[in-house]
Amino acid sequence: MLLAIDAGNTNIVFALVDGREIRARWRIATEGRRTADEYAVWLVQLMAIGGFTREEIDSVVICTVVPRTLHNLEVLSAKYFGVKALIAGTPPLDWGIDIDVISPETVGADRLVNALAAHHLHSGHKIAIDFGTATTFDWVDEKGAYRGGIIAPGINLSLDALVGKAARLPRIAIEIPKTDSVIGRSTEESMHSGIYWGYIAMIEGLTERMKQEIGQPVTVIATGGLASLFAVHTSVFDVIEPDLTIRGMALLYEQKAPTKFTAHSGGFAADFSPL
């Protein structure tokens, strides 16, 4: 079974993937100082609660946009699961899709695994919208080439900036406003309107402009924890794929399975035998 570790700026998701089925997933706050042992204590206990054992894990893939987390996640893979992890985005990794942009090496690994999953799951042109710490819009053409996109502040980031810089504004929950009116009758209603309806306007406006530039029919795929929140009041999404990133990581692993990794008393050593 594959352990897929998706380390974002806000949370790290650990998912167990068996073939094309995602058997379980757990989430922990991203913390660069957390050690491999700390990850293991937390993860192995949750696996046990779910009825899984360490011995069932025979492969690991890691996708991180937070470099300081990578080393300890690699140690976690080697020390506790006995395998060398495949690292998404590590040169000279061949993604299996063309990356048709300026400076391909600067594109985030999370955006590329989303592109890979979008290409394999849907035909034609695709726009993958991922609601994370940043909100990203990524275009994958009908041949599977990654053609670029948009990076905008995520909704939590926008709210943090608003509350942090405006001393008299209160912290509010990110939720669907209680009224369809965009005109707030109180400070809280006005903030809900700006955050929620403002984001709807951004999503619809940017997606429409991308469609106009592409000039061909496009499937719009939404992913990330807040996708379903916005789907209530916009018809711009054709598909919601909550696990797009994890599915892309599993596809990447299928294409580029790494070698075995064995531990011994003097440290860790790769035996380079195929899985």
Curated annotation (Swiss-Prot):
<keyword id="KW-0173">Coenzyme A biosynthesis</keyword>
<comment type="similarity">
    <text>Belongs to the type III pantothenate kinase family.</text>
</comment>
<keyword id="KW-0067">ATP-binding</keyword>
<feature type="binding site">
    <location>
        <position position="187"/>
    </location>
    <ligand>
        <name>substrate</name>
    </ligand>
</feature>
<dbReference type="GO" id="GO:0005737">
    <property type="term" value="C:cytoplasm"/>
</dbReference>
<keyword id="KW-0808">Transferase</keyword>
<keyword id="KW-0630">Potassium</keyword>
<feature type="active site" description="Proton acceptor">
    <location>
        <position position="110"/>
    </location>
</feature>
<dbReference type="GO" id="GO:0004594">
    <property type="term" value="F:pantothenate kinase activity"/>
</dbReference>
<dbReference type="GO" id="GO:0015937">
    <property type="term" value="P:coenzyme A biosynthetic process"/>
</dbReference>
<comment type="function">
    <text>Catalyzes the phosphorylation of pantothenate (Pan), the first step in CoA biosynthesis.</text>
</comment>
<keyword id="KW-0547">Nucleotide-binding</keyword>
<feature type="binding site">
    <location>
        <begin position="6"/>
        <end position="13"/>
    </location>
    <ligand>
        <name>ATP</name>
    </ligand>
</feature>
<keyword id="KW-0963">Cytoplasm</keyword>
<keyword id="KW-0479">Metal-binding</keyword>
<dbReference type="Pfam" id="PF03309">
    <property type="entry name" value="Pan_kinase"/>
</dbReference>
<comment type="pathway">
    <text>Cofactor biosynthesis; coenzyme A biosynthesis; CoA from (R)-pantothenate: step 1/5.</text>
</comment>
<dbReference type="InterPro" id="IPR043129">
    <property type="entry name" value="ATPase_NBD"/>
</dbReference>
<feature type="binding site">
    <location>
        <position position="133"/>
    </location>
    <ligand>
        <name>ATP</name>
    </ligand>
</feature>
<feature type="binding site">
    <location>
        <begin position="108"/>
        <end position="111"/>
    </location>
    <ligand>
        <name>substrate</name>
    </ligand>
</feature>
<keyword id="KW-0418">Kinase</keyword>
<comment type="subunit">
    <text>Homodimer.</text>
</comment>
<protein>
    <recommendedName>
        <fullName>Type III pantothenate kinase</fullName>
        <ecNumber>2.7.1.33</ecNumber>
    </recommendedName>
</protein>
<feature type="binding site">
    <location>
        <position position="130"/>
    </location>
    <ligand>
        <name>K(+)</name>
    </ligand>
</feature>
<dbReference type="GO" id="GO:0005524">
    <property type="term" value="F:ATP binding"/>
</dbReference>
<dbReference type="InterPro" id="IPR004619">
    <property type="entry name" value="Type_III_PanK"/>
</dbReference>
<dbReference type="GO" id="GO:0046872">
    <property type="term" value="F:metal ion binding"/>
</dbReference>
